[in-house]
Amino acid sequence: MDEEPERTKRWEGGYERTWEILKEDETGSLKATIEDILFKAKRKRVFEHHGQVRLGMMRHLYVVVDGSRTMEDQDLKPNRLTCTLKLLEYFVEEYFDQNPISQIGIIVTKSKRAEKLTELSGNPRKHITSLKKAVDMTCHGEPSLYNSLSMAMQTLKHMPGHTSREVLIIFSSLTTCDPSNIYDLIKTLKTAKIRVSVIGLSAEVRVCTVLARETGGTYHVILDETHYKELLAHHVSPPPASSSSECSLIRMGFPQHTIASLSDQDAKPSFSMAHLDNNSTEPGLTLGGYFCPQCRAKYCELPVECKICGLTLVSAPHLARSYHHLFPLDAFQEISLEEYKGERFCYGCQGELKDQHVYVCTVCQNVFCVDCDVFVHDSLHCCPGCIHKIPTPSGI
């Protein structure tokens, strides 16, 4: 009988004496412990890069932003809404830098409703402009996960099978006001192969846990603004494609940008096909632009899917910038600073190595600090030491 309570509560073992994880420094601060948690999260993301795994390179992502009254809380400065919109501006820039042939859209949910801030588009300027304007938005009412997901699904379910369909929810509230059973909607999302991930700003919510688990997404709750930015950065890289997703050759067009001057007698001003959208912010009649090589329809920006013939229009640099996702840089080997016998300076920033651990490239054997290690894997995608060893052609 005495052993029974112990067996029934065995699952609670991971939550016993959690205060022992926290350690104070000389001044009584817990900052060092929190920084250690964030540091381990950075390293984990480097190791989680999917080498030689088929990825969803062409992505369609809807970001759902909670616009309820809880976004006025000031635990993030100056408040949750302003902090979120600023971080999303950074996220949009990074997203299109790493995924130039992908598209993104933004949905805001408040007062039990959902409305589109921007449609799915490959134009980062359009999204950033809308995010800047949304700073003046009033936050009130409760969010509706059901209405937000339904709105995103209505667009995503029509996307081609070879593209990834994703939803990222920034959820501040602890409640959701839905018109119907959200668990039925989760089953529909799973059938439509839409991956839903959630970043919580308050605490873990049961329905979000089920939503992320059933659709193959992730669910995290932020610690602070720095951790918030890290969690958003986690969604910049393309996710692994599911084994059931279609695999097919994609026909693409590579239009050249045509520039015509007013002195050219043959030049005729024309509208961009983007003007088919009533809310388009593109300029009016223009002389130049990108002309579809198949049907000669005109567009002001790339990448885009031709509204006339359906051809995907991109530029060669767009594909080149997507290439590194297929062959990611291997993780550097972590070594204790005491065990490392080489120079005590980082090869990347030339700073003195002071951390407990250093990181060595397994190919060129050069050593890096943790910040350069994360920068090389998240932004540079190639080892500076390995590139330096490549001989320069004699003709240059």
From Swiss-Prot:
It is found in: Nucleus. It comes from Mus musculus (Mouse). PROSITE patterns: VWFA (PS50234). GO terms for molecular function: zinc ion binding. Component of the general transcription and DNA repair factor IIH (TFIIH) core complex, which is involved in general and transcription-coupled nucleotide excision repair (NER) of damaged DNA and, when complexed to CAK, in RNA transcription by RNA polymerase II. In NER, TFIIH acts by opening DNA around the lesion to allow the excision of the damaged oligonucleotide and its replacement by a new DNA fragment. In transcription, TFIIH has an essential role in transcription initiation. Residues 60-236 form the VWFA domain. The keyword Chaperone does not apply. The lineage of its organism: Eukaryota, Metazoa, Chordata, Craniata, Vertebrata. Belongs to the GTF2H2 family. A zinc finger (C4-type) spans 292-309. GO terms for cellular component: core TFIIH complex portion of holo TFIIH complex; nucleus; transcription factor TFIIH holo complex. It holds the Pfam family C1_4. This is General transcription factor IIH subunit 2. The gene is Gtf2h2. Component of the TFIID-containing RNA polymerase II pre-initiation complex that is composed of TBP and at least GTF2A1, GTF2A2, GTF2E1, GTF2E2, GTF2F1, GTF2H2, GTF2H3, GTF2H4, GTF2H5, GTF2B, TCEA1, ERCC2 and ERCC3. Component of the 7-subunit TFIIH core complex composed of XPB/ERCC3, XPD/ERCC2, GTF2H1, GTF2H2, GTF2H3, GTF2H4 and GTF2H5, which is active in NER. The core complex associates with the 3-subunit CDK-activating kinase (CAK) module composed of CCNH/cyclin H, CDK7 and MNAT1 to form the 10-subunit holoenzyme (holo-TFIIH) active in transcription. PANTHER family: GENERAL TRANSCRIPTION FACTOR IIH SUBUNIT 2, GENERAL TRANSCRIPTION FACTOR IIH SUBUNIT 2-RELATED.
